[in-house]
Amino acid sequence: MKRIAWGITGSGDLIKETYDIMVDIKKKNGIEMMVFLSKEGETVLKWYHMWSDLQNDFPDFKKEGGPNSPFIAGPLQVGHYDALIIAPATANTVAKIVNGISDTIVTNAVAQTAKGETPIFILAVDQKRGTVQTISPQGKTMNLKMREIDVSNSEKLAQMENITVIGKPSDIYDILGVSKD
């Protein structure tokens, strides 16, 4: 059985799609998932009316108390988990990782995991230049203009050791080697 650590940041963009895929993977494949949230991850899940879903689908999830609380970096670093997935990752999270700042549970998990051999997969939401469409908490389509600095940081992230940037939520099926059907 595979063990996956899944970190959720404060990104509303791609949160619903990512969440649905992770639930599908858990239900169909029996993959053990340890879910942890940044403080803003909690805020966004509540704003998108997904908080009760999380409580039902992943009842043992962990909320950030500080950069190393709850303690998850150690088990990630020593290979207790087969992969660390951060999805979706905000521009703020990506900027911190790229600049070596590990002051949240998510950025600290990435920094410490990168020192070991556990692979890290990050779904950075700001990867493409121009305007992208996303869904608001009210279910309406809205356009977001990507800032050059955020796209540039996503490109830098892709060059970092032991980190793979994934392009879309459905790529998670492929990295875990599970079927979409």
Give the predicted meaning of each segment.
Residues 1-181:
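A cross-family phosphate/adenosyl-ligand binding-site feature
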